[in-house]
Swiss-Prot record:
GO cellular component: plasma membrane
InterPro entries in alphabetical order: MFS (IPR011701), MFS_dom (IPR020846), MFS_trans_sf (IPR036259)
Protein name in the entry: Putative sugar efflux transporter DR_1322
Membrane topology: Multi-pass membrane protein
Keyword Nucleotide-binding: no
Transmembrane segments: 10-30, 34-54, 69-89, 96-116, 135-155, 161-181, 211-231, 246-266, 281-301, 308-328, 341-361, 363-383
Matches recorded under PANTHER family: SUGAR EFFLUX TRANSPORTER A-RELATED
Record keywords: Cell membrane, Membrane, Sugar transport, Transmembrane, Transmembrane helix, Transport
Keyword Ribosomal protein in record: no
GO molecular function, one term: transmembrane transporter activity
GO annotation terms (biological process): transmembrane transport
Main localization category: membrane
């Protein structure tokens, strides 16, 4: 695979940059900047909306260019500038402006780097491009296993300024290997080439309507983020567990997610991506139902094994699925996939908070199960095949 090592290093450093600072952004806004809960909500909402708008625009622009690298480097440079600014700015409006103007652009680094990698792998034979992207997604997940712990250690010793300076350094280093990667030459037309094993299922016309697919992934994103936000509160407040137990369960899920992703790469024969995604959504329904029923650690451990399998499918293959549905538009496809998670996250905070306020923490997971079931139904409807006469 061309430039695989350089791209792997860039993805690892990008993952470290986002995972070092991301988990502590709300804490920084409240403790260091002095934002009120309303200001924090506005800050996070404006950031998310700006990120969706900017990344969508950049994704469309990138697909019209023969060389995507300048845009990739632009998003990484925005990350450097954003975290350099946050290491010194302590005014509410200054931090908000940094978020809307710089963090929004840096959020496009994830889809742009992966689109750049996918376009570079485009001429590899068979299903190697899809498998290579899955490996890179596993590397990004590994960075999120390591990054928050490193960020917490840096925060304890050098405060928020140290965390943000380290994140800026990771953004800068992520761009270095990309400087030495030449843009891929246009792929020659191969009308008689056979489809790869990962794309065989998508060969049957018509292609699923993107509106239904996007809606399904957005509902999945809502369920995923709602479950993630409320899980620690459910364990500690409802089941009277400890923060150490929460850390163990979350860490177990993150660790198991990576080998499951790599299993997709190493397996010789796989069901179609479409089938795996629908199966993953059904498995998510079971995952949330079991959390709702859980009374202690044994069942909670089982739920995290299921969650790891679901996240491996949806994160590892979801991006590939969008790229298959939008052939030749790698930036737009990857950006659209990424934006479903951003929008789902934005909606999840409001809905989860209101639901927990009225019904308590445990029923939140029934709502997550319902959202996952609705997402599965949408995917089932979107991918239905016309019956032959």
């Amino acid at each position: 695979m061309p430039h695989a090592l350089g791209l792997t290093l860039a993805v690892l450093l990008l993952g470290l940059a986002t995972s070092l600072a991301g988990p502590f952004m709300s804490l920084f806004a409240v403790q260091q900047v002095g934002m009120t809960p309303l200001q924090l909500g506005l800050f996070l909402t404006f950031n998310a909306l700006s990120a969706v708008l900017v990344s969508t625009r950049l994704g469309r622009w990138a697909d019209r260019r023969s060389d995507r690298k300048p845009l990739v480097l632009l998003t990484l440079a925005a990350g450097v500038l954003a975290y350099l600014a946050l290491s010194g700015v302590r005014s509410v409006y200054g931090v908000m402006a940094t978020g809307v103007l710089l963090l929004a652009v840096s959020s496009a680094a994830f889809p742009q780097v992966f689109a750049f990698a996918r376009s570079g792998f485009a001429q590899a034979p068979g299903d190697l491009p899809e498998k290579a992207v899955t490996v890179l997604r596993a590397v990004f997940s590994f960075a999120w296993v390591v990054g928050p712990g490193v960020g917490a250690a840096v925060l304890g010793r050098w405060s928020f300024s140290g965390v943000f300076l380290l994140a800026a350094l990771c953004y800068a280093l992520a761009g270095l290997p990309l400087l030495f990667i030449r843009p891929p030459a246009p792929a020659p037309a191969q009308p008689n080439s056979a489809p790869s094993p990962l794309t065989q299922e998508l060969g049957a016309p018509p292609a699923p309507p993107m509106g239904w697919v996007v809606a399904a992934f957005t509902l999945y994103g809502m369920a995923m983020h709602m479950g993630m936000v409320m899980f620690s509160l459910f364990v500690t407040e409802t089941l009277h567990g400890t923060s150490a137990q929460v850390g163990f369960l979350v860490g177990l899920c993150a660790l198991l997610e990576i080998p499951v992703m790599l299993l997709f790469v190493l397996s010789k024969r796989l069901p179609g991506v479409e089938w795996l995604i629908k199966a993953g959504l059904l498995l998510f329904v079971v995952h949330f139902a079991l959390i709702y029923l859980a009374q202690g650690m044994p069942l909670l451990i089982a739920t995290q094994v299921l969650r790891a399998a679901v996240l491996a499918v949806m994160a590892g293959l979801g991006m590939t699925y969008f790229q298959q549905l939008m052939p030749g538009r790698f930036s737009a496809a990857t950006t659209l996939y990424s934006n479903t998670s951003v929008v789902g996250s934005m909606l999840s905070g409001i809905v989860a908070g209101a639901w927990a306020q009225v019904f308590g923490y445990r029923p939140v997971f029934l709502l997550c199960a319902a959202l996952s079931l609705a997402a599965w139904g949408m995917m089932l409807w979107a991918t239905r095949r016309p019956k032959l006469a």
